[in-house]
């Protein structure tokens, strides 16, 4: 990939995704390569995306529990990633951050943007 990530589950410390509706997070887990197609529900139910899981997702709570302002909602994921990197995420703080995936979408899943953040060497 352009970011050099070959195995997202092993190489990403966390992900912030645009979970605007209940099935969206499940679909994104599959489309972003975190699990096989058709296994998104099982992957989420496994606890892998919860705090303490091997790929915490939406550590700030996500749009479904935080708020859903529409397309500008992606800024919440960016803000959370910055807080995590700075060590300012309080009870949500993750121990080891190397790479973080941020995802945004709009137009009813027709437009997507994904970026991978990492620490400077």
Task: Describe the residue ranges of each PLM region.
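Claisen-condensing/thiolase-fold acyl-transfer catalytic domains that form or cleave C-C bonds
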Residues: 1-121
